[in-house]
Amino acid sequence: MKKLWFALIGVVLAFSASAAEFSDGKQYVELDKPATQEPQVLEFFSFYCPHCYQFEQVYHVPDAVKKALPEGTKMTRYHVDFLGPLGKNLTQAWAVAMALGVEDKITPLMFDAVQKTQTVQKPEDIREVFVKAGVSAEEFDGALNSFVVKSLVAQQEKAAADLQLRGVPAMFVNGKYMIKNDGLDTSSMDGYVKQYADVVKFLITKK
């Protein structure tokens, strides 16, 4: 019993120590907005953004965050339209990916096509990436101008405007907290990824 007691104390102290490391203005910024009723994490990115490529495809930060979240926490990723000549087209394409449930298939292929091979130069090229991901051209075209996709595009644009988004990658917790990349430990990739996920987990339960 005594061993169990000390073990529990150790867990509490470890949690308190890690929580104490995170403060407003350093690892996150508290926004002058009401918190969402349900816990949620909202990430903004762009297929044109080199830092987003690193964030998603090299560091795999969103994957680490997902794993750290309490069960039932909603995590959503939105594309921004203010970067690149096809920014609006890619935001619409991301809405298609969301509607069809193929975000995980599209993400690596589209990042590669936009940034590495640079084979996405016109709207038609975006369709080809979906075809490569296993979505037929007919299915893509049918979804592109659907009501669902139009609604998802509007949601992405409204969320970015409401949060006065100025850059990506960006992650918001409960609509009230924004993670500050420059306040995190970047001395090692593993340390950065773990701390990022820990800050998000801390903010999810912050009252």
From Swiss-Prot:
Signal peptide positions (record): 1-19
Q: Name one molecular function that GO assigns to this entry.
A: disulfide oxidoreductase activity
Query: Which PROSITE patterns does its entry note?
Result: THIOREDOXIN_1, THIOREDOXIN_2
Disulfide pattern: C49-C52
Which positions fall inside the Thioredoxin domain?
Answer: 20-149
Q: What Gene Ontology cellular-component terms does the record carry? A: periplasmic space
What broad class describes the main subcellular location of this protein? Answer: periplasm
Database matches in CDD domains: DsbA_DsbA (cd03019)
Q: Where is this chain's protein located in or outside the cell?
A: Periplasm
Which of UniProt's keywords are assigned here? Answer: Disulfide bond, Periplasm, Redox-active center, Signal
The family database entries (SUPFAM superfamilies) matched by this protein are listed as: Thioredoxin-like
Q: What does this protein do?
A: Required for disulfide bond formation in some periplasmic proteins such as PhoA or OmpA. Acts by transferring its disulfide bond to other proteins and is reduced in the process. DsbA is reoxidized by DsbB. It is required for pilus biogenesis.
The family annotation for this protein states: Belongs to the thioredoxin family. DsbA subfamily.
This protein is called Thiol:disulfide interchange protein DsbA
* Lineage summary: Bacteria, Pseudomonadati, Pseudomonadota, Gammaproteobacteria, Enterobacterales
Gene, per the UniProt record? dsbA
